[in-house]
Amino acid sequence: IDNISGNLFEDQKGFQGLHQDLKFLENYPYIEKFLRNLFCYQCDTQKEADERLLWVLAWMSKSFVNYDKRRTAIVIHGAEGTGKDTFVNLFFKRYFSEKFCSVVSNEELKSNFTSQKLASCLLCQMNEIKGDFRDGNTVFDKIKTLITEREFKYELKGQNSLYLPCYFNVIICSNDTKPIQVSDTARRYSVF
């Protein structure tokens, strides 16, 4: 798959136009199968699956080409071994490099201090998130802020806090069946 994804990057010139149709995926059957297994397994029709896959590819394309903050997080939940980390590693870490892709745990989000990893990343993978739906849940509020705001409070232990630009997009991965609280009107999350 590593060689295949490398060719995909070269052929698509940084993913420009990637999200316009799925025909180009015919040249990458393993990647197409992987993406469909990860994002379309709950779809009832081919049309629904294609629309869902196009949405994911558009999200990726705009992240890669414009380094655009999408203000909507991709939430991937499922059993172990479904490919959540592989998706991030195969596409995002390969494109942005490990240096600009940060993995933040549930425990780091619970902390009063900000993970130093967030200061310079372009993609934040929130890994093994577990839903805590009590009122006043600071993790839930922190996640919402990191997804949508253009700045975030950067607070290190023993130092004054400051606000930094928030360029990164968020992918939330979890084995939990309900990793995050999403209402019917939520605009911040696309759950797969």
What is the predicted role of each segment?
Residues D2-I129, V139-F140, S190-F192:
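P-loop NTPase catalytic core of nucleic-acid-dependent motor ATPases
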Residues K33, N37-C43, E149-K153, V170-C173:
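A Trp-anchored, charged/polar loop motif used as the substrate-binding/catalytic surface
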Residues F113-A119, E155-C173:
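AAA+/SF3 P-loop NTPase mechanochemical coupling elements
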Residues K130-G131, N175-P179:
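Conserved nucleotide-binding/hydrolysis micro-motifs of P-loop NTPases
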Residues D132-F140, V182-S183:
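Conserved ATPase-coupling elements of RecA-like P-loop NTPase cores
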Residues V139-Y163:
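Conserved catalytic/switch belt of AAA+ P-loop NTPases
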Residues K144-E151, V170, K178, V191:
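Signature of the SF2 helicase/ATPase Hel1-core->accessory helical subdomain module
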Residues Q181-F192:
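A short helix-turn-beta junction within AAA+ P-loop NTPase domains corresponding to the substrate/partner-engaging
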